[in-house]
């Protein structure tokens, strides 16, 4: 069973580890929600060295905040607790804007560096997604 060392996403650290450990050309699949910063440099290097594909795993429920009133929200990565009014249009708009910005960043960084992209919801068949991806590349 896999147990993460940390709840914080650190794509840069993962890519740097990969660059140090794997010396030959390889096909690499990087699975993440890609809600992270500061991995541009290591992504650029890794995408030149490897046949790299980013697989963004996401839950459709995470794309928007439902209107359920004032709720405590703990940032899973920082551990910070905040009370948030989910009925607020501004709160929901800011959340959606930030979420969409992360997705666009992932797509633009991977495209810019010539890396492959797969988006896969947690309730979808990853096998179908991979087969479709390989058919497009063939």
What are these regions (language model features)?
Residues 17-24, 44-138:
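Von Willebrand factor type A / integrin I
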Residues 31-37, 52:
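Active-site glycine- and acidic-residue-rich loops that bind
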Residues 1-26, 36-38, 58-59:
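Von Willebrand factor
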Residues 37-40, 127:
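Short, well-ordered alpha-helical microsegments
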Residues 28-32, 115:
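Domain-scale detector for complete catalytic domains at protein termini or as standalone homologs
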């Amino acid at each position: 069973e896999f147990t993460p060392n940390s709840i914080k996403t650190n794509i840069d650290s993962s890519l740097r580890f990969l660059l140090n450990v794997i010396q030959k050309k390889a096909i690499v699949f990087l699975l993440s929600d890609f809600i992270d910063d500061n991995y541009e440099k290591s992504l650029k290097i890794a995408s030149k060295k490897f046949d790299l594909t980013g697989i963004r795993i996401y839950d459709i429920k995470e794309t928007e905040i439902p209107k359920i009133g004032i709720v405590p929200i703990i940032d899973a990565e920082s551990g910070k607790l905040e009370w948030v009014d989910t009925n607020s249009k501004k709160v929901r708009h800011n959340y959606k804007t930030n979420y969409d910005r992360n997705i666009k960043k992932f797509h633009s960084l991977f495209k810019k560096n010539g890396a492959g992209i797969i988006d896969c919801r947690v309730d979808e068949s990853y096998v179908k997604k991979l087969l479709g991806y390989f058919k497009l590349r063939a």
